[in-house]
């Protein structure tokens, strides 16, 4: 006769209590022992239902060893591992490599939720298999007691109900239910008072927020200090569920940010792979053109490229692994909270809530470290330059080896007749057809007037006089064929330089009517060479915007001269009127001249067979700006190419009545529009590594035009280092002195337009044109932006300007330094030391001390920034200058 299940519930007596001792048949047994690992034969013989259960609860397995987690431990990263995989407390998680900082005792939290779920699943498997044994007599079980959590046969069930009267159900009914129904029915909602002094555990539904413990009615009445903090424990648990759910929703939004950063990292790796493949293809293509002599060099170049790739890949891969670890923690936390909401009991939520909340709060503080980091995916340009020099050296040796003895014997005679054609290494690089064309052009020059050049020992040749080359004879017959070729004459080998020119009656009239104070032209304009980007269209000039200024003594040039675009900007801020003289408000006398000088070569690629097309197609735009010393804001901005000029002049308020006043933002927009008329030009500046460009970048950023400016240009060209290479013997490399010496021009140091015109004319005179030889002097926008971001360290005297430049050349920004220090305050900044100048030679003991002092100063400054106040500038100045000056 079957006994109906009794619905009356009774609190289970603790082991050893008198109630338990009354029932001799009810011996103390453990409640639901942990299940054993199923054998391989059992796994192969699983039913479809069992396989579905195993797939649904796969998360109960240890993610490290994929075995049934015994004594599961919950780590702060919210990964659950078995006790076997958790080798020692405080170690890193083997899944996400997160540091194992657990609770105050240094141990991971027992995952009571997983352990309870494993036990209940094991019981359900026994019930479904119809092989459940009675936990008392080991006979075939027929009932399941939800209070004792034991399997009971019919005989033991009668005694069990006689003494305990617990709720029990036949196993036949449970077999028809699903695993979810069984797990839901076994979720206990009975919570007992946390006071251990009770003789019998007392059920309670009161929770004290002050004690953070459940209390019975008696204990709640005695706890008068926290009477206002008592609440219903069910409502409190529900509030905890909602709080954890809200935190997981916030983490999901944060996860999308990490997904975006992860995608950028993967894209960067793809770009890095593409860059490596591209440079390897170029290297192999050029090396295949030579014989076995160059194979050893090929291997060296490929190894260097691979080393650079591995270094850059490791940097990106390290950040990628950190992002993947945080993403995995976010997904794990969300899954754990959802599963606890589905399957965890209230007691389990009470036990684990504080730990979960602390872990989720720590996870919410994570931020992607790559949001403002510029990725290094174009770091192979230096290998292209090495390859170019290598090929040039080989070509020179091959041409020298095949030269005939007759040519070698005739060379001195030719040099005495035509000094310009003295054989140089550059001449050996040119094909015979090019050299023949140059010889024809030189013969043609015999019929043209020439300008002699005086030679000073140790200095660059200085022109004595010059005429404009206006006649069609030379321009059509020689300039079009030889204009794009490079012809150099070393001033150690020749005593003079021949410049082929033609003097016309019009030029003589201009010379007669020119100012007596000026004995030669102050500037020149090349009329024959085409545009810097390779196009030649003299009629496609930019329309002029004329704005009349007071006291304008500018002498307009002839109608054939290109017009200029001038935008005058009025500023509401006060400035010193003495800084704006009358000759600064006009176009300056150096801009227009009745005498024009034209060199024999245009600003095109010097060696078309070796220069890269994408560099040749770029337009050189000479660019300069002036910063007001008092306001530290832009006072002038000027740019010029071969066809048009652009100037922004910021005047004080007193001059606004004479000009068409526009805002600074409008003026910068006009400047961007001027740049967009060309295809990604190269901005040529006299000084890149100064305070001017950072202020310019900040101004563009204030009007949200910085990224548009980045997309408009292709890079920055340092002009003065190029001039230093061409004329190493010059007495001074200041732009004003160079203009006075080689252009016979008195340049105004306070005029931005005069500076850019001087740079343009110097580059034209020295035959500086776009092409591969300029690549080593062209810097990317990202490098200059990184240098701008390092300005706070320079201003705080923590980082010298020269060392900031070295960091910027490796695309190391201030944000990257700060994040590296925040991540690892002991070792985070050391990896950047090898970029600095001290690493060019082996470190001595004194140099090591200087490096340590520099790192200490930089760390002190970073610590001050993280704490909300920067350290004293004198402290950083003393340490950094002693290290890197």
From Swiss-Prot:
Knockout consequence?
Mice are born at the expected Mendelian rate and are fertile. They show leukopenia with reduced levels of circulating granulocytes and myeloid cells. They are highly susceptible to infections, causing a reduced life span. Mice do not exhibit normal apoptosis of hematopoietic stem cells after DNA damage due to irradiation. They do not exhibit normal apoptosis in response to FAS, TNF, TGFB1, interferons and ceramide, and show impaired activation of caspases in response to pro-apoptotic stimuli. Mice are highly susceptible to chemical carcinogens.
Cite a single GO BP annotation: suppression of viral release by host
Binding positions for Zn(2+) 1 per the UniProt entry:
62, 65, 82, 85
Q: Where is this region: Sumo interaction motif (SIM)?
A: 566-572
- Region Interaction with PER2: which residues? 458-565
Q: How is it modified after translation?
A: Ubiquitinated; mediated by RNF4, RNF111, UHRF1, UBE3A/E6AP, BCR(KLHL20) E3 ubiquitin ligase complex, SIAH1 or SIAH2 and leading to subsequent proteasomal degradation. 'Lys-6'-, 'Lys-11'-, 'Lys-48'- and 'Lys-63'-linked polyubiquitination by RNF4 is polysumoylation-dependent. Ubiquitination by RNF111 is polysumoylation-dependent. Ubiquitination by BCR(KLHL20) E3 ubiquitin ligase complex requires CDK1/2-mediated phosphorylation at Ser-528 which in turn is recognized by prolyl-isopeptidase PIN1 and PIN1-catalyzed isomerization further potentiates PML interaction with KLHL20.
What PANTHER family does the annotation carry?
BONUS, ISOFORM C-RELATED, PROTEIN PML
The protein here is known as Protein PML
Supply the source organism for this entry. Answer: Mus musculus
What gene is it encoded by? Pml
